[in-house]
Amino acid sequence: MATSKPASIAMISLGCPKALVDSERILTQLRTEGYQVTPSYDDADVVVVNTCGFIDSAKAESLEAIGEAIAENGKVIVTGCMGVEESVIREIHPSVLAVTGPQQYEQVVLEVHRAAPPKADHNPYVDLVPPQGVKLTPRHYAYLKISEGCNHRCSFCIIPSMRGDLVSRPVGDVLSEAERLVKAGVKELLVISQDTSAYGVDLKYRSGFWNGRPIKTRMTELCAALSELGVWTRLHYVYPYPHVDEVIPLMAQGKVLPYLDIPFQHASPRILKAMKRPAFEDKTLARIKRWREECPDLTLRSTFIVGFPGETEADFQYLLDWMSEAQLDRVGCFQYSPVNGAPANELDGAVPDEVKQERWDRFMAHQQAISAARLQTRVGREIDVLIDEVNADGAVGRSSADAPEIDGCVYVGNAATLRPGDMARVRITAADEYDLHGDAV
């Protein structure tokens, strides 16, 4: 008896790694139901666009992607953070089939069913989905989302209005997913959330179970358990709460990568207060010094905003001086951009665009010099490098100091035998502002 052809889905995933995990979850469910995933508009029965709505430029990119999908395919379902602005989307693109917000996985799947019904004779026991689900990253690393939402109300941010308050995943579920990923060949787990250090607060840190033993739903205990899997564990989106000090010994012992991604956003106490950043009075520089004393190889990554309403030249100079003292390893910087619905829009003291640009240029030049000097200290050392790509010129990988896509790379010569996913020992021979160069040994 002839069988029906399975429907095909194309997915466009925009924005942060947290949105990428949402896309993976949607695709995994659809694959379980027999849908095929295609990278082509032409072969897709319907296109799902997972949007970003964090800042205006991200919204513009999302609207452009929706328009392209409509032009190339015609049957488009919109989801993700910008989905909370359905009226805006439908005003510009009235032909979209459906619009859903973030975390509405079941609704997205339902809308896909309506647009392209699943294959009636699909047998899930024959067409198996791998235990780790559908992944959109290379097979040797994966994002591990531990919670959704955020309890903070930073004045420049609208994420809580889109994704709600903090909801932590059960620790047993997180660890079981991590275990499946490692069994599937993942060499690096990138722990993500809106606020990783708040993991478990909403659950009052109650214990869950993994492999028959109790584990507290808390960042430190989660990291200790993840270290048992024998792969790199990298922490992202960590706020500098006091208990963050507890993970530094795990890093010093080699159980967790010596890498902390902490979005400081600014250094001026006055601007931090206007931003309504948590723990803005912390003596952060003193803590950074203590962390590095305990774990000398610690890499610190952060992001900053310049040109925030009310930022004076004195505030900006305070930030530059703080950067000189902090000696952060990896830094991103954004010019402040008003976000529809953010309380910061009501603040006085808007900074002119040309001043924002000038401060951004100075900030990046300042940090570039710091980065170059810090990377220079690695020349002559041997380090472990996880290989991401192999080409005619050699291999490209990342050290413990480099998260994918946002940090630098290690360019590796003498790499004829290396393959993506290999862990190579590399002697560093040169460094520039952001990257290292070396040879496999």
Swiss-Prot record:
Compartment list: Cytoplasm
**What are the record keywords, sorted?**
4Fe-4S, Cytoplasm, Iron, Iron-sulfur, Metal-binding, S-adenosyl-L-methionine, Transferase
Domain (Radical SAM core): give its ranges.
Answer: 136-373
Which GO MF term does the entry hold, naming one?
aspartic acid methylthiotransferase activity
**Domain spans labelled MTTase N-terminal:** 7-117
Where does this protein have coiled-coil stretches? Answer: none
Q: What is its main location?
A: cytoplasm
User: What sort of enzyme, by top EC class, is this?
Assistant: transferase
The answer on whether this UniProt entry bears the keyword Phosphoprotein reads no
Is Calcium given among the entry's keywords? no
Annotated Gene Ontology cellular component terms: cytosol
Task: Specify the superkingdom.
Answer: Bacteria
Q: What is the role of the protein in this entry?
A: Catalyzes the methylthiolation of an aspartic acid residue of ribosomal protein uS12.
For this protein, the record's HAMAP family field holds: MTTase_RimO
The UniProt similarity line reads: Belongs to the methylthiotransferase family. RimO subfamily.
Name of protein = Ribosomal protein uS12 methylthiotransferase RimO
Organism, per UniProt? Bordetella petrii (strain ATCC BAA-461 / DSM 12804 / CCUG 43448)
